[in-house]
Amino acid sequence: MISIIIAYATPEKQVEIPLTVEESCTLVVAVKRSGILQQFPEINLSQAIVGIHNKRTALDAGLRDGDRIEIYRPLTMDPKQARLLRAKRGKIRRMVRGEAG
């Protein structure tokens, strides 16, 4: 038996589910056994991007003791747009505080 963690996060909540599975268990089987799909019905496992320790991984991948399986949410905003928005917010904060920028 091996010990793993299933992780998923929304903007409001982060969940980590510890799980013990057989050494022959695949990623998809572990996710289904964890119950996370019932907690977060918005997860579509057939379309979700998953990874182990921040590295994208296939659903049929084998697991090792200590693996952290992560289920990634789709991006809600283009990364370039998000950076521009954060930069504008920072500039406004500096102006309000009277800092040069």
UniProtKB/Swiss-Prot annotation:
Transmembrane segments: none annotated. PANTHER family: UPF0125 PROTEIN RATB. This is UPF0125 protein CBU_1303. It comes from the Bacteria. Disulfide bonds: none annotated. Belongs to the UPF0125 (RnfH) family. HAMAP family: UPF0125_RnfH. It comes from Coxiella burnetii (strain RSA 493 / Nine Mile phase I). It holds the Pfam family Ub-RnfH.
